[in-house]
Design a protein with these regions (language model features):
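Acidic/histidine-rich catalytic cores of soluble enzymes
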Residues: 115-244
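Tryptophan-centric aromatic hotspots in well-structured domains and transmembrane helices
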Residues: 8-10, 35, 122, 156, ...
Length: 296
């Protein structure tokens, strides 16, 4: 069982925007906290691949994946770094029909990535567990894709009303990875998600090539996201993320491990923490230590 962490956990949206610690500093902290692998962001891949390789070698880390819209440029870089997957971190879809559209798009991306030995995955939040025509949107997506994998964010799945071990077993050999995120409450998927065809729909990642933006513009974007997260609704979204193994946790991590072990390959685990109950690095170190002591 590989226990990794995403660079997203070191700054959240600020990390997407290339603000805060350098990539090497993040790698050093990740190593010191006890993790052995890392999931990158698009902005991380704006560094020269040879520099990233050097920093990985210096810290003893390996790359598993990147959270990015899968383009051939991104896929090539992930292959050069020895990674396993490019994970689409989310895109709007609100119905069975739109889920099928996304499934076909992901299959096209997967066909592009196959020659490079890279898998294409989709990462969920809670809204993908909205029901339409008898199934959740994420089930419609996977049922209509033959090449796409799931990176099941177990925290958002449980939060949205889906029992992760059930989902993993239903889609055996389709779970390339999981995001480890604690949860203490089932909230549900919310109202019908946004349509990908509404005005201002998907136009590519808002975080693509962010280093080309002036620092002031990036800070303005961050301030907007920070205001959303500090709103009453934003705080409510993350307050359900408790300490790993806490009494209030409603996620059965041991059963998740059993379900994953039934696959024909090893899925990689990525810690992604957005809610902090204590000092930032202590929470992440606790996550890593708890997994190693209780799950491996």
């Amino acid at each position: 069982m590989k226990v990794g962490i995403g660079t997203y956990s070191f700054g959240g949206i600020a990390s997407y925007l290339g603000l805060g610690p350098t990539l090497l500093e993040k790698f050093q902290t990740i190593r010191d906290l006890g993790f052995t692998s890392v999931e990158l962001l698009p902005v991380d891949l704006e560094h020269d691949v040879e520099d990233i390789k050097k920093w990985l070698s210096e810290t003893g880390l390996t790359v598993t994946s990147v959270h990015a819209e899968p383009t051939e440029e991104i896929v090539k870089k992930m292959a050069a770094l020895g990674g396993q997957a490019v994970i689409w971190a989310g895109t709007p879809f609100c119905s069975k029909a739109e889920a099928i559209e996304v499934a076909h798009l992901l299959d096209e991306m997967a066909e592009m990535a196959e020659p490079y030995g890279i898998k294409i995955g989709y990462h969920n939040h809670s809204q993908e567990f909205y029901f339409d025509e008898g199934k959740t949107l994420l089930e419609h997506l996977l049922d209509n894709s033959t090449k796409c994998y799931s990176q099941l964010d177990c925290g958002w799945a449980q939060n949205g009303g889906m029992y992760p071990p059930y989902f993993i077993r239903k889609y055996k050999n389709r779970i390339v990875s999981i995001h480890v995120k604690e949860n203490s409450k089932v909230v549900g998927p919310g109202d019908r998600p946004a349509s990908r065809h509404q005005e201002g729909g998907p136009k590519g990642s808002p975080f693509a090539n962010v280093k080309e933006l002036p620092l002031e513009e990036r800070q303005k974007i961050l301030d907007g996201f920070t205001a959303q997260q500090n709103s009453p609704e934003g705080k409510k979204r993350f307050e359900v993320q408790c300490k790993m193994g806490a009494p209030e946790s409603n996620i059965d991590w041991k059963e998740i491990k059993k379900a994953l072990d039934e696959q024909d390959f090893e899925a990689f685990w990525v810690v992604e923490r957005e809610g902090f109950y204590d000092e930032h690095d202590k929470c992440l170190a606790d996550d890593c230590a708890w997994l190693k002591e209780n799950i491996q």
